[in-house]
Amino acid sequence: MKTIRTGMMTLAALAVLGTNVVSATSEPVKELSVNVNGQHIEQAAIFDKGQQTVLVPLRDVAESLGFQVKWNAETKAAEVNKGAIFSYAKVGEDRYPFAKMYKTLGAEPRLLNGNTYVPVAFVDEILQAEVNVTDDAVTVVDEESDVAPVRTGTITTLNKREDGGVSFQLNGYETGIILHVDKETKITTADGKELKPEDLQLGMEVEATHQKFMAMSMPQSGAVSIVVKSGLETPEVLGTAGKVASIDKDQEGSYKMLVEGQALAENAPEKVALIVGKDTKIVSAKDNKELAPEDLKAEMKVFAYYGPKLTRSLPPIGVAEKIVVE
């Protein structure tokens, strides 16, 4: 039996979050995006508060994994079949055929908006695929697929070459990966709008899938798909990566942080003083967890992003839009 990995937020924490989806019992549930073998699935997964588990749309997920799915009107069950694997999901029954016996998964299928939803454990234990669950996404990977699971995080460095090629670093130096973008890479916004490689910017939060092969030095791979979840407000993003030389809090509650290191954009300084306020987004490169200004300390390694409006002083002073902490 493989293990379903759950990161960033426990199922108990998911239970307190609501969304606009309505279940068969009219109880609000939490929506999660679904990605199978690098491809986004339009039908969202949901968190079933009553059963304390995530449910995924059976047909969309199973068919994306190469299974045949059909509805058996006589037994009132959704059947799945691929090779030696046959099973079914019947609403109201925690009982699933597998390898000439029955398994219980601790949760029952649900019928929502005319679609059969199954516990995420069904994908792992019955469909035999690798599953990763975070606070807002379910990633499914067929063990035979050449696509690695989705990585979510921030574009910390960005290299746009004269030949039109683009490569970027996701989530910093220590825990990140370098992804190469080519004409085959599918780039979209979260609502499905197509983007071009040149639309990528420093500080963007993205979901990226890549090929499983990676170089032996710092991990590098070709990006298969990129979904831009959010970007910074300024159209021209500057950035500086380095150590926090100092950070001080003023009487109004804002922080002033001095960063010394490497310029990440053509017009960016290597040394910059940044105002860190309530609108500054601060995240950890390791797990994308949101941090507070008071979590910033001297000597921390950071990637700081800001707009082009800087004072003419030395060092120049600006307003931090986003900070990624290594």
From Swiss-Prot:
Residues 177-304 are annotated as: 2 X 32 AA approximate repeats. The keyword Secreted applies. It is found in: Secreted. Keywords: Protease inhibitor, Repeat, Secreted, Serine protease inhibitor, Signal. Its main location: secreted. Thermostable at neutral and acidic pHs. It comes from Brevibacillus choshinensis. Sequence repeats lie at residues 177-208, 272-304. Shows inhibitory activity towards serine proteases, such as trypsin, chymotrypsin and subtilisin. May form a trypsin-inhibitor complex in a molar ratio of 1:1. It comes from the Bacteria. This is Protease inhibitor. Proteolytically cleaved to yield at least three forms (BBRPI-A, -B, and -C). InterPro entries: Cu_amine_oxidase-like_N (IPR012854), Mao_N_sf (IPR036582). GO terms for cellular component: extracellular region. Residues 1-24 form the signal peptide. One of its GO terms (molecular function) is serine-type endopeptidase inhibitor activity.
